[in-house]
């Protein structure tokens, strides 16, 4: 398909033809066209044309938003464009482009900030008009600007665009000296928004392969009419003195003419420069075999342009529909019809024949087939897993992830000790994290995962401890038999390749569980604070209590007598903890203070104060900073008592009077019931469900194709390693671990290498094992910080739990839809679940999830809390049941579709402690 555009004096006529000798490689599908292209015809046409190198085109639907695709991509090349305008006796550089535009301000002598090019419709019409009559020279063999200039003036003279007497004057003008504008780039107000601090020159100089376009535009009153020439060099060459940097030149565009010619030379020059900076137009210009295809490329560019009527824009928010409309137009623009274009999403041309990406969850039909595939896929890269760690970015990731892993270890350790009466605590959790983390990083198929303790496991430990206590069974011994059954279950699941079941866990189930854990965190925080107020009550006047016999500030000993059948009796003495004045108020201040500091630093991270790297660093370490401040406050207030984190000295267990480092499977203080050894398979199945959910979903998130990891994942092998280590860990009385979603995603993000630009694109991930090993080892060594850890107030950790519970709600679609229940329809977001589904259906879906959430909460608060994972699994068949009955497939795709886009750059209100599964 070709576009034949002819221009009269004041009107543009647009006419499409269907006899194209060279189909545009990227062209919008015309109305009524089915989109079926004759690939065989394209191959025949390709054979008849001159050989053209293979082209690589990004096919990511969001690629047009990124710099690397906004700029020209030919293999590894990017397009760099300079606009030079004739001013007196020299050419002055006034603009430059690498996808985005920078303009030189002669008044200040500085370059302005980068911005999206904006063009007048008149300049495009003028450009199209003069291009239809100008000189177009394709595949010129020249290595100097003088050779190009001579060819241009001769071609213009031959076509009658200039008079013979004008030839020498035009040649002298084209060869005038060039004045490069070397002023500093001006920083815009609010200066560290990524779009504004993007630098064209930095992007140009840091890119390995660049090709340049020179645009020369200016007024020459000696000419009779405007003259235009477009030159495509056969080979890109460095032309000395032509550009401000030694970049190979591929295209040269010349536009000169009289001031009375009816052409705005500045705007027309900017329009041509913007065209050359557009990767689709530049690609078509590179492939065009004749003049007509080049003019058609301009028509294609205009087809995708948007004209804003000359009305006042009172609010920037009014431009949002334009942005959404432009995204749709740009997606429609990517219509490949030329087999010379190799679609690889940024891959090299020689990678076009690579095998399609293997599905790691595909079943082989043989026992342990999935695990064997995981091992073959990953272990062939084992040596590179260590050599790839020789990168400074890995060291930076280790330091960052260490604090990201240490804070939850301390927080969960303190809460675990409180829930289990110190049968397990900080020391056990830190040692477990250290040993299991090192082993996992050393042999796992996906060492990018960070393993650790999590909220769901804490809920299970609390429920299992309460069950054992009610049955007068030794909790720490029962965990051994649960661990043994865990190993048996995981071997069976891995043997039958059961990891494929993760495909059935949709957003419907994930978000219900996510909000449940968040609510548990919030509830437990205020529950603990309430217990402190009860143990240390507030009294209006303390003085009269000094002489009272019922002084609440002294320990109270109460006796409980138990009579036996043989006539003997046992006297139990219960010592109630002494109540302290001001403890409750100080505890509340420490809890909310820790929460608000962490929350403020989270907001500060996405604010405008301080340079971006410093601000983000402070925000990333917000939780440790908040804990440190609360320690300082607690130390300065000496007269008030607060409960501190209990940490044993050295490698001692948390409760040395009740247990040691090795647990006797047959019982520590009394024989373990034989029936319970077999019955432990039930809690083992439940805790396996939790580990399976967290680990497999985390692996699914980290291993998404959009992250461009190349060494494979380990759904089967990693699950076997995790659960087997947990089973062995039970013998030593240390916690089970699972893949921690937040820490794993943060680890992957820290190891990700991004392209430069206002909307960076993932280039690769430094997949290696060293960072995971070092982080785990450093967490283990941190147990030596016992003197410092003992200074942490427990209520400060409650504040962190409140922080984790509240921030984890951010970004959960179910929570957003719950808020929409009280939001007017006109304020609904532009997301598919709110715009493509009726309001009643959307609210019905939300209410179903809320009913499931309520049922799970009732189970959690009842004596059957151990059954929580089983009840959670029941939401999977429920989701299948409502599909096709209450909701159509299209509605479910909008309401329950998984988000395939990787969120690397954190949005406002989002940080490393947020997670779908806290």
From Swiss-Prot:
Chain intervals for the UniProt region annotation (Disordered): 1-48
Gene3D superfamilies named among the record's database cross-references: Helical hairpin bin, Mannitol-specific EII, Chain A
Catalytic activity reported: hydrogencarbonate(in) + chloride(out) = hydrogencarbonate(out) + chloride(in)
Major localisation: membrane
GO molecular function, one term: solute:inorganic anion antiporter activity
Highest rank taxon of the organism: Eukaryota
Cytoplasmic side: 1-392, 446-448, 496-507, 605-615, 698-713, 751-769, 810-847, 879-918
Role played: Functions both as a transporter that mediates electroneutral anion exchange across the cell membrane and as a structural protein. Major integral membrane glycoprotein of the erythrocyte membrane; required for normal flexibility and stability of the erythrocyte membrane and for normal erythrocyte shape via the interactions of its cytoplasmic domain with cytoskeletal proteins, glycolytic enzymes, and hemoglobin. Functions as a transporter that mediates the 1:1 exchange of inorganic anions across the erythrocyte membrane.
Protein family: Belongs to the anion exchanger (TC 2.A.31) family.
Subunit structure, as described in the record: A dimer in solution, it spans the membrane asymmetrically and appears to be tetrameric.
Record-given protein name: Band 3 anion exchange protein
Originating species: Oncorhynchus mykiss (Rainbow trout)
Record gene name: slc4a1
């Amino acid at each position: 398909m070709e576009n034949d555009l002819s221009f009269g004096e004041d009107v543009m006529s647009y006419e499409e033809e269907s006899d194209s000798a060279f189909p545009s490689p990227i062209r919008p599908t015309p109305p009524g066209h089915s989109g079926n292209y004759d690939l065989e015809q394209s191959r025949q046409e390709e054979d008849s044309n001159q050989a053209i190198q293979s082209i690589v085109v990004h096919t990511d639907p969001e690629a047009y938003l990124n710099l690397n695709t906004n700029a020209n991509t030919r293999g590894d090349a990017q397009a760099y464009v300079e606009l030079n305008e004739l001013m007196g006796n020299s050419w002055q550089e006034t603009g430059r482009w690498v996808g985005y535009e920078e303009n030189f301000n002669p008044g200040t002598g500085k370059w302005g900030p980068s911005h999206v090019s904006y063009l007048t419709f008149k300049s495009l019409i003028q450009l199209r008009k003069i291009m239809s009559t100008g000189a177009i020279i394709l595949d010129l063999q020249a290595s100097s600007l003088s050779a190009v200039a001579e060819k241009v003036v001769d071609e213009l003279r031959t076509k009658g665009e200039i008079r013979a007497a004008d030839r020498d004057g035009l040649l002298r003008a084209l060869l005038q000296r060039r004045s490069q504008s070397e002023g500093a780039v001006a920083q815009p107000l609010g200066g560290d928004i990524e779009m504004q601090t993007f630098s064209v020159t930095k992007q140009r100089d840091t890119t390995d392969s660049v090709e340049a376009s020179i645009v020369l535009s200016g007024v020459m009153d000696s000419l009779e009419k405007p003259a235009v020439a477009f030159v495509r060099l056969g080979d890109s060459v460095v032309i000395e003195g032509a550009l401000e940097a030694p970049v190979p030149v591929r295209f040269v565009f010349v536009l000169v003419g009289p001031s009375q010619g009816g052409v705005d030379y500045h705007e027309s020059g900017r329009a041509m420069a913007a065209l050359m900076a557009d990767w689709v137009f530049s690609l078509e210009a590179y492939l065009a075999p004749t003049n007509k295809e080049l003019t058609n490329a301009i028509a294609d560019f205009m087809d995708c342009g948007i004209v804003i009527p000359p009305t006042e824009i009172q609010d920037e928010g009014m431009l949002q529909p334009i942005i959404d409309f432009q995204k749709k137009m740009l997606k429609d623009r990517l219509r490949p019809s030329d087999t010379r274009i190799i679609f690889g999403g940024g891959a090299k041309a020689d990678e076009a024949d690579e095998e399609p990406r293997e599905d790691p969850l595909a079943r082989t039909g043989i026992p342990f087939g999935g695990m064997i595939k995981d091992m073959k896929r990953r272990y062939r890269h084992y040596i590179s897993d260590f050599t790839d760690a020789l990168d400074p970015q890995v060291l930076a990731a280790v330091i960052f992830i260490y604090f990201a892993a240490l804070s939850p270890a301390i927080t969960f350790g303190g809460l675990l000790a409180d829930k289990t009466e110190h049968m397990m605590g900080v020391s056990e959790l830190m040692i477990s994290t250290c040993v299991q983390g090192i082993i996992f990083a050393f042999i796992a198929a996906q060492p990018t995962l960070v393993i650790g303790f999590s909220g769901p496991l804490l809920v299970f430990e609390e429920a299992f401890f309460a069950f054992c206590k009610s049955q007068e069974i030794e909790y720490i011994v029962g965990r051994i038999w649960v661990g043994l059954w865990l190993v048996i279950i995981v071997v069976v699941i891995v043997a039958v390749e059961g990891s494929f079941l993760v495909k059935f866990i949709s957003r419907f189930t994930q978000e219900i569980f996510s909000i449940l854990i968040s609510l548990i965190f919030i509830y437990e925080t205020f529950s603990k604070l309430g217990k402190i107020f009860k143990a240390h009550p507030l009294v209006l006047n303390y003085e009269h209590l000094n002489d009272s016999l019922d002084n609440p500030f002294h320990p109270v000993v109460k006796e409980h007598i138990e009579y036996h059948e043989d006539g003997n009796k046992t006297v139990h003495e219960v010592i109630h903890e002494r109540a302290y004045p001001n403890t409750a108020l100080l505890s509340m201040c420490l809890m909310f203070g820790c929460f608000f500091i962490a929350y403020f630093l989270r907001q500060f991270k996405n604010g405008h104060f301080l340079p971006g790297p410093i601000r983000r660093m402070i925000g990333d370490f917000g939780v440790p900073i908040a804990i440190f401040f609360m320690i300082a406050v607690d130390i300065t207030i000496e007269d008030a008592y607060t409960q501190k984190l209990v940490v044993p000295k050295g490698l001692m267990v948390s409760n040395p009077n009740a247990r040691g480092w090795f647990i006797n499977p047959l019982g520590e203080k009394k024989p373990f019931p034989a029936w319970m050894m077999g019955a432990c398979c039930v809690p083992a199945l439940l805790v396996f469900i939790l580990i399976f959910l967290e680990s497999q979903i985390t692996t699914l998130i980290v291993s998404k194709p959009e992250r461009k990891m190349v060494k494979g994942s380990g759904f089967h092998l990693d699950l076997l390693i995790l659960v087997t280590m947990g089973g062995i860990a039970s013998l030593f009385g240390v916690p089970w671990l699972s893949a921690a979603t937040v820490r794993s995603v943060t680890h992957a993000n820290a190891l990700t290498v991004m392209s430069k630009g206002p909307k960076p694109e993932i280039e690769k991930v430094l997949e290696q094992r060293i960072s995971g090993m070092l982080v785990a080892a450093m967490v283990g060594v941190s147990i030596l910080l016992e003197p410092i850890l003992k200074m942490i107030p427990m209520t400060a950790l409650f504040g962190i739990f409140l922080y984790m519970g509240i921030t984890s709600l951010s970004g959960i679609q179910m929570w957003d839809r719950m808020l929409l229940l009280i939001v007017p329809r006109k304020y609904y977001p532009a997301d598919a679940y709110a715009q493509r589904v009726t309001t009643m259906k959307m609210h019905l879906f939300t209410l179903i999830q809320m009913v499931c959430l309520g049922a799970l909460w009732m189970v959690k608060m009842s004596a059957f809390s151990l059954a929580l994972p089983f009840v959670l699994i029941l939401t999977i068949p429920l989701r299948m049941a409502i599909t096709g009955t209450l909701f159509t497939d299209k509605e479910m795709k909008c309401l329950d579709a998984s988000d395939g886009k990787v969120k690397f750059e954190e949005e406002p209100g989002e940080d490393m402690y947020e997670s779908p599964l806290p």
